[in-house]
From Swiss-Prot:
Active site per the UniProt annotation: 143 (proton acceptor)
Summary of activators and inhibitors of this protein: Inhibited by phosphoadenosine 5'-phosphate (PAP).
Consequence when changing residue 324 to L: In strain: cv. C24
Membrane-spanning intervals of the chain: none
Known catalytic reactions: (Z)-desulfoglucotropeolin + 3'-phosphoadenylyl sulfate = (Z)-glucotropeolin + adenosine 3',5'-bisphosphate + H(+); (Z)-indolylmethyl desulfoglucosinolate + 3'-phosphoadenylyl sulfate = (Z)-glucobrassicin + adenosine 3',5'-bisphosphate + H(+)
The keyword Transferase belongs to this UniProt entry's keyword annotation: yes
Protein name: Cytosolic sulfotransferase 16
Taxonomic lineage from the root: Eukaryota, Viridiplantae, Streptophyta, Embryophyta, Tracheophyta
Highest taxon, organism lineage: Eukaryota
GO biological process, one term: response to jasmonic acid stimulus involved in jasmonic acid and ethylene-dependent systemic resistance
GO-annotated molecular function: aromatic desulfoglucosinolate sulfotransferase activity
InterPro entries in alphabetical order: P-loop_NTPase, Sulfotransferase_dom
Record: residues binding 3'-phosphoadenylyl sulfate: 81-86, 165, 173, 231, 301-303
């Protein structure tokens, strides 16, 4: 923010171009529907059929106006807490496997989120981070619903992968994750109240099921451009999916790499167990390239399938399962297990 002095000695504050743009977004956001979020002072804003924190909505508008996707870019798409960190690690390891010796891979020293920037967060608010200064980097990520993606992404023809997860585990992973957030908006709502809001679609980037369905429909319309994956299936047997992901990205493993077990090495490097136990992802360590509201360790809780059973009652589970059946009925999604 700049200031100048007028002839009568008064000071006039002039906004930077970025601040002017942000104010334009904020003025528009102020006109949109609002609802209380999962914390006493958290306000969510409805836009495009989904709920947003104001800063994320500003980031969306900034990305829509300024992000320039290239045909060679690759986008990791997901709803929060559905396997994003794992998928970021895998895509980074696949793309960069010939650049580093096994022992020198940057994933061993830094959190995966530092290498695959969010278009609505990193690009919008932290444009000077290293990865965004590297024009050779083809990897980006987003939680933006498919129908709201920036035009440059839609029109560029760049490929993307989407991962989804059982809503019961997604909710539990999100609720426990939010407990680790450095928030000024008050204590997180109870499990029961948060669950009720999640089921009603009231969550950041929610409704979750609509988020999944949007990418599923896009995948059905253009399967050559979107790879649609299920977390549970990948966790059960990651190797064939890592090979499929690499091939889809245009970085397929060669016969020599197959013989040398390179795909297996990628799976091991990016495994939950490996990443969780790295010094970079332990304790209170945070990413070093920009401010963060979560310690790196927050992204590695259990990584297990079915942990919801330790939290949800049978009635709560049945409620979500019923919503899933209703939302995905006749879409073919529940029969798509890869």
């Amino acid at each position: 923010m700049e200031s100048k002095t007028t002839q009568n000695g008064s000071e006039v504050v002039e906004l930077t171009e970025f601040e002017k743009t942000q104010k334009k977004y904020q003025d528009f956001i102020a006109t949109l529907p609002k609802s209380k979020g999962w914390r006493p002072d958290e306000i969510l804003t409805q836009y495009g059929g989904h709920w947003w924190q104001e800063c994320l909505l500003e980031g969306l508008f900034h990305a829509k106006d300024h992000f320039e996707a290239r045909p060679t870019d690759f986008l990791v798409c997901s709803y929060p807490k559905t396997g994003t960190t794992w998928l970021k690690a895998l895509t980074y390891a696949i793309v960069n496997r010939s650049r580093y010796d096994d022992a020198a891979n940057p994933l061993l020293k830094r959190n995966p989120h530092e290498f695959v920037p969010y278009v609505e967060i990193d690009f919008a608010f932290y444009p000077t981070v290293d990865v965004l200064q590297d024009r050779k980097n083809p990897l980006f990520s987003t939680h933006i619903p498919n129908g709201l993606l920036p035009d440059s992404i839609v029109n560029s023809g760049c490929k993307m992968v989407y991962i989804w997860r059982d809503p019961k585990d997604t909710f539990i992973s999100m609720w426990t994750f939010l407990h680790k957030e450095k928030s000024q908006e008050g204590q997180l709502a109870s499990l029961e109240d948060s669950f009720d809001m999640f089921c009603k679609g009231l969550s950041v980037y929610g409704p979750y099921l609509d988020h999944v369905l949007g990418y599923w429909k896009a995948y059905q319309e253009n399967p050559d451009r979107i790879l649609f994956l299920r977390y549970e299936t990948m966790r059960a047997n990651p190797l064939p999916f890592v090979k499929r992901l690499a091939e889809f990205m245009g970085y397929g493993f060669t016969d020599e790499e197959e013989e040398n077990g390179v795909a297996e090495k990628v799976v091991k490097l990016c495994s939950f167990e490996t990443l969780k136990n790295l010094e970079a992802n332990k304790g209170d360590k945070e990413r070093e390239d920009r401010p963060a509201v979560y310690a790196n360790s927050a992204y590695f809780r259990k990584g297990k399938v079915g942990d919801w059973a330790n939290y949800l009652t049978p009635e709560m589970a049945a409620r979500i399962d019923g919503l899933v059946e209703e939302k995905f009925k006749d879409t073919g999604l529940l029969q798509h297990d890869n």
